[in-house]
């Protein structure tokens, strides 16, 4: 190798190293950044995937955690803030979305668990009552912040009240990650399986 080739290699390496690392994952045209921030803390994209019903693409979802986890137990136990980011891929009446939420929650929690978080389930249901339709392109975000609670956002704007119990957030996560997930192909995608 001559000096010119070595110099070219060093210049190319320096240019490559200076490029920003935008490792976004694309799910049905929706880009999920590799990192995000919740409550001032950086989170990593644990996984992202597509929610389908029959043959229809309903939404793309991404799960952000403080550190990557591959099992449901680890995800539910991970400390710090968390985020579920959902981008709608079709119009869905909020009544249908709320019904699917309730069915997913009921399928993956016991009656005792639901009774403990019933006030928060009711508040969450009120959120859907405020929005008649989730439209294609809408972004729904569910953030968990320790010592504060769960806050929902629609297109970046807060909707509904803060729901304080972590058991509620974990119950919501189990809609996608529980033993009976709403979409069996979305669960492994959110757990970062390729």
Named regions from a protein language model:
Residues 24-78:
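N-terminal secretory signal peptides
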Residues 18-20:
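N-terminal signal peptide c-region/cleavage motif recognized by signal peptidases
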Residues 3-7, 11:
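N-terminal export leaders
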Residues 69-147:
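Mid-length scaffold segments of soluble, non-membrane domains
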Residues 29-32, 144-148:
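A short, compositionally biased
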Residues 154-157:
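Short strand-turn-strand beta-turns centered on an Asx-Gly dipeptide
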